[in-house]
Amino acid sequence: MSERKKKKKMLRIILIIAGVLLVLFIALILWLPSFVMTGTRQTLEEAFAWQSDHYDTAFYDTLEKTDYTVNGEDGYALHVELLENPTPSTKYVIISHGYTDNRMGALKYVPLYLDLGFNCIIYDLRGHGENEPTFTTYGVREGEDLNCLIEDTRSRYPDLTELGLHGESLGAATTVAALKYKPQVDFVVADCGFSDIENVLREGYRNAHVPGFLVDLADLGSRIRYHYAIKDMRPIDSLDDNEIPVLFLHGEEDTLILPKNSEDMAARTEGEAEYHTIPGAGHAESVLIDPELYEKYVKEFLNGIETDEA
């Protein structure tokens, strides 16, 4: 084989390898945001079974329930469920669940609010539960959805005299993100939420010894595939001029979303804020590990708000 043919063959091989690497690189860019934003969701049955294994859910079957749907700003239908307090009440709380969970995941907080005299509204965040499959925007569209649910709640229940929000993990971030819209609510309880999803991803990748630049690739892929930037998913920015009282709770042993996220948000809000950690609790475990302390913090917070308003 002549030298010229050898060079042509070598160039062809190099181009093929470069082409394969380019295809793999593009595939990685498009796959990363899918991995980050479309995790495997639980069914209602799976979530309820998990709740029943870890908490007493016998109360659920005794409650009067009403199922309905509420449309988000873009017309996306959210499945909602009202759990009526056995004692007639005009107080309501909307509870938002965490990532890959669904409204059954909110049941762990329902007994606390029933005891406090609230009717409880639980719902499936977009892309979860009975809703149509879609990707998660870590508070961006979810916050808009929650604001629509807040407005619907006030319209649907005209006897309402008090309305609060409670969220866990993604639900907490969603709850904080909704404050951007200045909703007419009386209080917020945000449990183990993130201030911005980028810091959570970078911390998780670092702990897994995965190169941090993959977060940047995921951000690029998210912009291309979903038209949302991971770096813009920052619930903390909704707190700059917030005046609604917020209670931030976090498990001290949470390694998925570090307690500093809640601490930073408590420092950022313009309104009244409390920040407490639950010793020995990992991610989304606070009410399981120490229900008495959890209840104490929530009740004292709500009592403090009522005292301030008196």
Residues covered by each model-derived region:
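Short beta-strand/loop motif that positions the catalytic acidic residue
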Residues: 241-243, 248-250, 254
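The serine-hydrolase catalytic nucleophile loop
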Residues: 99-112, 125
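Alpha/beta-hydrolase active-site loop
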Residues: 136-157
